[in-house]
């Protein structure tokens, strides 16, 4: 079972200065880091926040509007996201949107490189098992659920009012009782309803909903039952995590009336789930949490351009403004007598490592991979099939497009937040 580690670490920025970060990392059973986020303790992330934004200008030839969510921050809004938008101020009844209009928007992508943050008018209210959407008013069900499960949820949820909102049933829903899912949907309904009622009392640039800290959001987005324990060595963070799970971090002892800190809690099992979650405050003066999980060395490896494979081959990752290029090198381990088998074996090993690195480093956008040339077409088919299987484990939408005539493999990975590399860039 995986564990989530949340700690502090000083990391060298690209200008060589050290800065303190909150490191939230997912580790597998073998204590291998498989996901990581770096957040400055004082960072105020915009991702997921809902604002009353004001339209600054509309550019029809790129089907976009530029919306201010604060006097200092302008965001990109695609006009394709305006269906069922909730306007608080509408200046034109004939045009879909004009400068001066005010509407509810949600930040769906952080500022990346030279691009402004992106917002959408299709608001999302995410729970553990379902997502309520204000613009897309249909019932969607996770593609990872089987036909029987999809049919069950269509029947179960037909009574919900999809004229006012849409629903997306997450993969995690299959791990809980129907009553738990329905209760969460009712809670999301109420949240959206209250926001619509209260917005008339708010002014432009008001923050209507503030997203949870990155380290809490990352944990919530893990598959149900995939994380057995959340561990931190920061008492303040531990108390925040406990409160997020509805647990007060201080408990009354049986022989006294003064609440005292407790270092570990078992999150009550939700009806219908088999696995529970342990919240742990770690404190050991002889061995820090960072040392126990080799956080610093794992991060150093995650920033290296070249990665060596067990076979002696290597992969090299290079970033450009437009895309990421990954090159697979065979090294000196090719045995001529078994050339075809060796080439396929090295490429399969590289494909597994590349899928791991994309998730670990949060590399997104267009990715071009130059595998070693294979000697048979059927081997190319095997490589692509296995690579797709490895990419399916990534919680972020990742698609293997195809292999080009030049033998380059095209992959796209959805852009949501900064890559690990961009986290170290100075603002």
Regions found by a protein language model. Give the residues of each.
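Loop/turn-to-beta-strand initiation segments
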Residues: 95, 99-102, 203, 362-366
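Short hinge/gating elements
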Residues: 133-144, 167-181, 199-206, 225-228, ...
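Flexible glycine-/small-residue-rich
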Residues: 6-10, 15, 26-29, 38-40, ...
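Extended, charged alpha/beta regions that create polyanion-binding interfaces
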Residues: 1-44, 49, 120-130, 139, ...
């Amino acid at each position: 079972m995986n564990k989530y580690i949340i700690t502090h670490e000083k990391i060298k920025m690209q200008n060589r200065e050290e800065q303190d970060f909150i490191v939230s990392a997912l580790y597998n059973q073998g204590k291998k880091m498989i996901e990581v986020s770096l957040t400055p303790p004082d960072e105020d992330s915009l991702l997921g926040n809902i604002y009353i934004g004001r339209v600054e200008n509309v550019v029809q030839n790129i089907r976009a509007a530029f919306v201010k969510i604060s006097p200092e921050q302008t965001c990109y809004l695609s006009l394709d996201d305006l269906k069922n938008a909730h306007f608080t101020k509408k200046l034109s009844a004939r045009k879909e949107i004009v400068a001066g209009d005010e509407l509810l928007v949600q930040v769906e992508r952080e500022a990346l490189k030279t691009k402004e943050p992106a917002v959408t008018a299709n608001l999302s209210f995410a729970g553990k098992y379902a997502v309520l959407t204000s613009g897309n008013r249909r019932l969607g069900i996770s593609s990872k659920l089987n036909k029987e499960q999809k049919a069950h949820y269509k029947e179960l949820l037909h009574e919900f009012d999809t004229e006012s909102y849409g629903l997306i049933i997450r993969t995690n829903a299959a791990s809980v009782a129907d009553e738990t899912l329905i209760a969460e949907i009712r809670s999301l309904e109420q949240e959206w309803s209250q926001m619509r009622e209260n917005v008339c009392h708010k002014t432009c640039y008001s923050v209507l909903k503030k997203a949870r800290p990155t380290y809490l959001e990352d944990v919530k987005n893990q598959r149900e039952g995939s994380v057995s324990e959340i561990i931190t060595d920061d008492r303040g963070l531990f108390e925040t995590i406990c409160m997020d799970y509805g647990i007060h971090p201080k408990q009354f002892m049986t022989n006294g009336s003064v609440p005292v800190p407790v270092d570990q809690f078992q999150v009550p099992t939700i009806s219908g789930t088999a696995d529970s979650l342990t919240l742990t405050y770690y404190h050991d003066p002889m061995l820090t949490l960072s040392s126990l999980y080799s956080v610093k060395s794992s991060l150093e490896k995650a920033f290296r351009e070249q990665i060596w494979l067990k076979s002696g081959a290597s992969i090299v990752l290079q970033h450009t403004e437009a895309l990421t290029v990954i090159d697979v090198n065979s090294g000196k381990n090719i045995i001529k007598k078994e050339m075809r088998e060796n080439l396929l074996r090295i490429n399969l090993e590289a494909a597994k490592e590349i899928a791991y690195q994309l998730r670990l480093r949060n590399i997104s956008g267009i990715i071009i991979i130059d595998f070693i040339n294979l000697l048979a077409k059927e081997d190319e088919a095997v490589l692509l099939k296995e690579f797709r299987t490895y990419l399916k484990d990534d919680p972020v939408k990742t698609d293997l497009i195809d292999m080009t005539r030049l033998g380059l493999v095209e992959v796209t990975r959805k852009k949501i937040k900064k890559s690990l590399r961009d986290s170290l860039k100075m603002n």
